[in-house]
């Protein structure tokens, strides 16, 4: 296998002309900066939860997964990547990050509280932080090779990737979000928002990268949800909140991650996996599989 690319969290290896091995590390990033410390088992959680959601949503939109079973991985792949690796189809990435928002939070809340809009789109007056939106909305950002992604309007996104591709990614993102939000709610979890990525192969648009993980989504425990603040979460908002207290300017290098934040993040990720899949994380593939 030949190393192809290293991202903030994942490493890609070329297996053949049309197959890649995608390996999720335990690295974690906030504000587009990779932190100096890792979260144990994080890569396995991301892969396990992605595998679950890719399987559950395949009837809604096709995806790039070939297999996450260690027995299907290339013989040159070592046992240490079991549970954190997927064999996937090679695609040409669409240069957008596609976001479905069901609740008013994060950067969407920041813009709304100042301007009454989200990505330039007017929303009803009087909404509060973390409030459920009248209906889920689609927003997008550019996919930057380095540095910060930039929010774009629907018109700018369509100009960037073409009208047809834009309409497809918008439809797929909202379709998947609505399905996943309903499933999560039945498990006592609110899916506040999520980010999806897409790629094209043989003129077919596929969902790629990860799906509905605590890295790419905001998950809130329904029993503790309240409008007007920052709900407890099963995602990396816990890490973001810590770094927001430090006065850090969000440029590398980032300060070290305290052990309490490392342990708390791992616990939240594992809990998200178990609540959503209904399975013990101990059952997911690991180095001893």
Predicted regions and their residues:
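Generic recognition of stable, solvent-exposed alpha-helical segments in well-folded globular domains
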Residues: 44, 48, 164, 168-171, ...
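Conserved metal-phosphate-binding beta-hairpin within the catalytic cores
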Residues: 100, 191-211
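A long amphipathic alpha-helix within ATP-dependent nucleotide-binding catalytic cores
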Residues: 161-192
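Active-site loop/lid in soluble adenylation, ligation, and acyl-transfer enzymes
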Residues: 1-143, 250-256, 260-289
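A short mid-domain helix/strand-loop element embedded in enzyme catalytic domains
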Residues: 132-163
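Catalytic cores of nucleic-acid ligases and guanylyltransferases
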Residues: 25, 47, 81, 179, ...
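C-terminal helix-cap and adjacent tail motif
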Residues: 211-272, 276
């Amino acid at each position: 296998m030949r190393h192809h690319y290293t991202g903030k969290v994942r490493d890609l290896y070329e297996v053949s002309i049309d197959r890649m091995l995608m390996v999720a590390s335990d690295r974690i990033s906030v504000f587009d900066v990779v932190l100096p410390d890792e979260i144990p088992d994080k890569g396995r959680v991301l892969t396990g939860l992605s595998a679950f959601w890719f399987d559950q949503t395949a009837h809604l939109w096709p995806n790039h997964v070939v297999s996450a079973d260690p027995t299907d991985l290339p013989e040159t792949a070592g046992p240490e990547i079991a549970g954190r690796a997927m064999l996937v189809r090679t695609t040409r990435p669409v240069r957008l990050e596609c976001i479905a928002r069901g609740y008013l939070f994060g950067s969407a809340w920041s813009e709304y509280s100042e301007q009454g809009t989200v990505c330039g789109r007017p929303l009803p007056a009087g909404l509060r932080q973390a409030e459920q939106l009248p209906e889920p909305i689609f927003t997008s950002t550019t996919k930057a090779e380095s540095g910060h992604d930039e929010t774009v309007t629907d018109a700018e996104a369509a100009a960037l990737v073409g009208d047809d591709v834009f309409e497809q990614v918008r439809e797929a993102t909202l379709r998947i979000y609505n399905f996943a939000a309903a499933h999560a709610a039945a498990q006592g979890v609110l899916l506040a928002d999520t980010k999806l990525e897409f790629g094209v192969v043989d003129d077919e648009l596929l969902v790629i990268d990860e799906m509905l993980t605590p890295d790419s989504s905001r998950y809130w425990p329904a029993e503790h949800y309240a409008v007007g603040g920052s709900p407890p979460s099963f995602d990396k908002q816990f890490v973001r909140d810590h770094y927001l207290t430090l006065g850090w300017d969000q440029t590398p290098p980032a300060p070290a991650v305290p052990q309490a934040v490392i342990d708390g993040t791992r616990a939240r990720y594992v809990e998200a996996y178990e609540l959503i899949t209904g399975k013990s994380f101990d059952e997911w593939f690991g180095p001893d599989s």
